[in-house]
């Protein structure tokens, strides 16, 4: 790490630097980001794009007194470097180290934790109103990207902020050119005028002078109408001003001097929220990331790029299968929320551009949009990461299941996802989806199971959830033809005695590993692929309970409300609680921290060794568990 960056231990150190030193610091920060993210993995392109903004923010404002809120938080790496976490930066996204997002527990400079999009304006407005109620004096700044601002929650907050007239700053990081910047001499002139305090002074005095003249109010109203028409045709900020914001920009997001001028100007406004429109280049300063910002949005550890392929990932198998199904059935459509490539829909979107819909970061809308299409005879497949589907829970109940509409939910990244941590682990979906009446909930044991379950879902005529994990498949042979798997029918993979392991999804593969360990100890368990969580294969569960002494459930999901809980309830209702000993292996009632998938599975007893140890503990202590109990690692 270069010497200049080594001297920055807190934001106050930035204020001692000259403009040339600040520019050099920006170069050094980018070098550190590229080096560290290449080793540890993480979100690179977004962080590279806001280096100058981060420097300017910490020079103009006084963090942590002033509150700087980063939407999503994945672009906060430079912020971490400049706020006393430089020496810990090598631990970024490592188990026990710095989070890849903002985190209140990590630093007072992170006033609001993040991981999901579109929350920063609501949170910032809440802080600003709390400040006013307490009669305190500090600034609140929310930084949000042009993707995250498309989320409905952002617009709800913007509408509320304009109504409240609270002192509050929103910075729109426009790195996708979704809002075309004005260019040329006129734009530069207007920006210079807007950032000049004399402009507001002159405007206020002009209004006072004109309105005091005969017919002055009418003249002023006419003048304002002309101004509005001019702005609507020439300036990108008229929408914001209609919403009650003062608009500043567009600003060059890589010009520290211009950024500081805009921030200082925004800081001076007392009675209205301000929006600063900043234009940046995603991946700035790293040629590969600038050339392909989508690819370098998130990279894997020690590769400097995307994961090398040693087989097909679950997302790829899903995409290939859906492509095949859509080729055969023109009524099938795909819907995603700003994750076309991440969810394996890229090639499908190219092949069927009229039948693949990316609705932006709008999960609630995605679900009800799908419901609307389903009423007209289409079969929508909604493809969303598990952690983000939580946002559409009410719509799943109210708009899909209450009306029994045939919407398929392809839930990617189910289970432990790893280094992205607490905000991204997909550990609640089996619970919240299986509690909804009329919802089929399934989890394939491997990639072949996945393709057949997707085919089943599309042909079921029911609300159907298909949950699959992050990462590569199990390497099994993928059959060329698709077939239906009867809903609610699970399968015995291995016949054994005394002990039965009922595993779902990815846990089936780890249960197979456990069988090898247990066999060496003289235990030969029955293994069930519990692919359907709802409806349960009650007949099979009861049959196993009556023919085995021990029953173990395994799932990468919170135990509460998941597979284990449902089986416990079934056995209790059948009066079998005193006839079989039960252990439920899963996630305890806690949020799972960041760390690689293998480490976390080992920690929570979800790998083959952990499952085997739990079974040995259960079988080796006959006095334990006279009644069903939840057993957590």
From Swiss-Prot:
One of the record's GO molecular function terms: 1-deoxy-D-xylulose-5-phosphate synthase activity
An example Gene Ontology CC term for this record: cytosol
Sorted UniProt keywords: Isoprene biosynthesis, Magnesium, Metal-binding, Thiamine biosynthesis, Thiamine pyrophosphate, Transferase
Q: Does the keyword Magnesium apply?
A: yes
Q: What is its EC number?
A: 2.2.1.7
Q: Reaction catalysed by this chain? A: D-glyceraldehyde 3-phosphate + pyruvate + H(+) = 1-deoxy-D-xylulose 5-phosphate + CO2
Q: How does it assemble?
A: Homodimer.
Which family is this sequence assigned to?
Belongs to the transketolase family. DXPS subfamily.
Query: What is the name attached to this protein's record?
Result: 1-deoxy-D-xylulose-5-phosphate synthase
Q: Lineage, please?
A: Bacteria, Bacillati, Chloroflexota, Dehalococcoidia, Dehalococcoidales
